[in-house]
């Protein structure tokens, strides 16, 4: 076999090979024998089909399998010549030429190799971090909210008029064009007035009502209402208010702490204040990281961590970004790209910078995760998707299966690993006193979240 291999840089190589037709044909018998052991042809026992018949009936498959074997051997020899192990091959080779001549094939391909990444400048990439530590006023605000959230609802004076934050029990039925509609009726339905559990105009109409009072009022469903058969429709609602309950105020003291920190043996108000302060600090930290510092850190990693990137992976990422962009394009723009190969190439090329950055950051994050032993368990991926499903009203099992079918679980895991790696680097750059706050919160993270 005539083989030439050239290493372009530490992450890219190019091969040129001219395997003979004779080399290909030598593989036919062996492949045909494998097929003969599996196929069943009328008139012959399994495994007893003549090779000549197998070669005739399965000629296309034999040719394809032989070519794949030949390509794998070319690739194996190329890696050997480069002194590279198979595990260091990144992605699939990009075959730029594959032509069958009279006596041989002409094959040319670009090969992506695992890049060499030096992480000695990582600390230079991490921006200075200073998270706002919540003051006493912020802590007291959260304590008041906790006292409200944990308060029980109790019956009240029958003459009370419904106010925001009251718990109402109602019967209601809605009509469109004098006819009841699906989902428009309920009995003994509970809601917190002002919570936006129902449409705002519906809740406003209940303000000022008293127990046992009945009321009719018109309501127009928003044009973007989630139930399409109701969107933009005018309805008439009949409502009966059965009961009004109000929150029984809780004092901010040790008793509140025992309710909120139910898993703690000796919960006190001071401990609750400490936990609230820590929780508020974590919220401030997450907001600062997500809205500002993580993106700044990514930009610094992209700018300062320099290494060769496998071009085959960049091209694959460009294809992915281009395909994803097609889904959000107007039909006219998609047709314009379909009608003009030049425009399609230009549009695809516009994703090169984003693709290069994405590939680079993925390699850096992967290297950092391995160095710092940061990972994500499969169960954590499923928990994240389960939470997403619950928040969007989807069936968790269906959502997970959808991600699995579309081979997206690995992407979710990688995104979670990236988030942890970036947070880890930023946490290390926190002032000492703020790192101490983090350390105090970690043992309690799984116990109780306050607020």
Curated annotation (Swiss-Prot):
Cell cycle recorded as keyword: yes
A Pfam cross-reference name: FKBP_C
Example of a GO MF term: protein folding chaperone
Keyword flag Disulfide bond: no
GO process annotations (BP): 'de novo' cotranslational protein folding; cell division; chaperone-mediated protein folding; protein transport; protein unfolding
Any one GO CC term of the record: cytoplasm
Keywords on record: Cell cycle, Cell division, Chaperone, Cytoplasm, Isomerase, Rotamase
Coiled-coil segments on the chain, per record: none
Domain PPIase FKBP-type: residue ranges: 165-250
EC number: 5.2.1.8
Similarity field: Belongs to the FKBP-type PPIase family. Tig subfamily.
Alphabetical list of NCBIfam families matching this protein: tig (TIGR00115)
Physiological role: Involved in protein export. Acts as a chaperone by maintaining the newly synthesized protein in an open conformation. Functions as a peptidyl-prolyl cis-trans isomerase.
Entry remark concerning the domains of this protein: Consists of 3 domains; the N-terminus binds the ribosome, the middle domain has PPIase activity, while the C-terminus has intrinsic chaperone activity on its own.
Protein name, per record: Trigger factor
Species of the source: Helicobacter pylori (strain J99 / ATCC 700824)
Gene this chain is encoded by: tig
